[in-house]
Amino acid sequence: GDWSSDVCSSDLAACNSAPPAPPFKPIAETKDLMELVMERQADIVWGATGTIITAEGVEERSPKTEEDWIAVKAAAVNLVETGNLLMLAPRAQDGDRWMQNVQKMMGQGEKMIAAIDRKDTKAMFDVGSDLYDTCTNCHMHYMPEIKDLYR
């Protein structure tokens, strides 16, 4: 054969082979990831907007300072990125419903980030409600022991 085509094809093979991925070493069980990361970040996102009515009066909640906005955006970004971790083995429960639930949560998280970027507290509240429903629906299926908490 033609030596130039042999050289080109071997060079192409070398260029197209990706380096091996770094080893993936999960240290948190799914339950830990949910309690230590997801739940804490979701509480920040959900607590950022809303109305609290008490005997003392009405409090409208929303981020006030640039630091407040950064904190709630960081929490929303952490929620979405934690979704990626939930889709990896050994955490992924199955390839169907689990993945759909995680992707739906991530989609809600992306909407939350967009609302935060617009500083749209009404949209943040509405998306927060949808996000809560998404989380609850997943918990009802994968954590049947907590159904009584949602009655």
Spell out what each predicted region is.
Residues 2-9:
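Short, small-residue-biased leader/transition segments that mark boundaries at the very start
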Residues 14-19, 136-139:
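Bacterial signal peptide processing site
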Residues 18-132, 145-151:
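Extracytoplasmic c-type cytochrome modules immediately beyond a signal peptide or single-pass transmembrane anchor
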Residues 142:
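Cys/His-rich microdomains that often coordinate metals
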